[in-house]
């Protein structure tokens, strides 16, 4: 498929919630495929993002934030996704926040494989109030684990991302490319549409509701340069449904409009999007329901 000398490998991006894993993936591949918000638990599935340059193909696996605070079946499924992702890859990227390393980070550290190269990414260096804190923090991290490289970055500002790519490239095996050079993800448009809508719910609604929300795409058809999408937002209680719909349907309309614009940008076509809200009590603790919603 490719001439000798090419490198291709899988890279798992792991860390506690809200360290910027999805933002890092989106900026590495220069396209938004993994949803982001300031709330924990935004990413729930493994997302594959693909970066191909002249020499190598990097297949990134963005994972949910590993955490033990919430014990629902959904959270247990997501933690299993994280652990499994570190067994099926060539390199692990462990993301922490500059100047901050707490118990949640330690819990992820304890799960890191000893038989694979682990690159430490210190993200959000732009938010450090005192830049002189960076070197001591890097030394502190070097003392807790034998990382193959430590790379400070600002994913949001695209700083040091090329250095991170080179640190990862050193550990990729010699393999032909697995995906076409213009592919950026192996996830379907149907899946990405659901994720983009769920992101809008996470960003616009208060603290509690998003954790009880899932999105199901009930219809996805392509008609020339038009994608016709019917989506359903699932919640657990009637009062959550009312919150998402908002007064005279305004919140739901705003979320749908923003999601549609993101879909049009990602798919490169016009999108007709219809969204409604349904109550499905207890779905986050129902194994059968979780499987039907695509949770692994």
UniProtKB/Swiss-Prot annotation:
Coiled coil ranges: none
GO biological process, one term: ribosomal small subunit assembly
Residues covered by region (G5): 153-155
Entry annotated with the keyword Cell inner membrane: yes
Residue stretches making up the KH type-2 domain: 205-281
G4: region residues: 123-126
Protein name per its UniProtKB record: GTPase Era
Gene source species: Nitrosomonas europaea (strain ATCC 19718 / CIP 103999 / KCTC 2705 / NBRC 14298)
Designated gene of the protein: era
């Amino acid at each position: 498929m490719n001439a000798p000398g090419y490198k291709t490998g899988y890279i798992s991006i792991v860390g506690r919630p809200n360290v910027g894993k999805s933002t890092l993936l989106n900026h590495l591949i220069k396209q938004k495929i993994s949803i982001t918000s300031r709330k924990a638990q935004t990413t729930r599935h493994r997302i594959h993002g693909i970066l191909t340059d002249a020499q190598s193909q990097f297949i990134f696996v963005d994972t949910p934030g590993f955490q033990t605070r919430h014990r629902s079946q959904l959270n247990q499924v997501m933690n299993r996704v994280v652990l499994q992702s570190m067994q099926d890859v060539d390199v692990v990227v462990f993301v922490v926040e500059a100047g901050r390393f707490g118990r949640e980070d330690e819990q992820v550290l304890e799960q890191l494989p000893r038989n694979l190269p682990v690159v430490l990414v210190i993200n959000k260096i732009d938010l450090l109030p005192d830049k002189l804190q960076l070197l001591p923090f890097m030394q502190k991290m070097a003392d807790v684990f034998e990382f193959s490289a430590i790379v400070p970055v600002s994913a949001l500002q695209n700083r040091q991302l090329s250095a991170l790519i080179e640190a990862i490239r050193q550990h990729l095996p010699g393999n032909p490319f697995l995906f076409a050079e213009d592919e950026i993800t192996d996830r379907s448009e149907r899946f990405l549409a659901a994720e983009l809508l769920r992101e809008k719910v996470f960003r616009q609604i208060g603290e509690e509701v998003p954790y009880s929300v899932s999105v199901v795409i009930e219809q996805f058809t392509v008609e020339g340069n038009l994608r016709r999408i019917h989506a359903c937002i699932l919640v657990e209680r009637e009062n959550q449904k009312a919150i998402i719909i908002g007064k005279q349907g305004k919140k739901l309309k705003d979320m749908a409009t923003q999601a549609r614009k993101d879909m049009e940008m990602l798919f490169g076509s016009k999108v007709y999007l219809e969204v409604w809200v349904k109550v499905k009590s207890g779905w986050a603790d129902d194994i059968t329901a979780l499987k039907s919603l695509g949770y692994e």
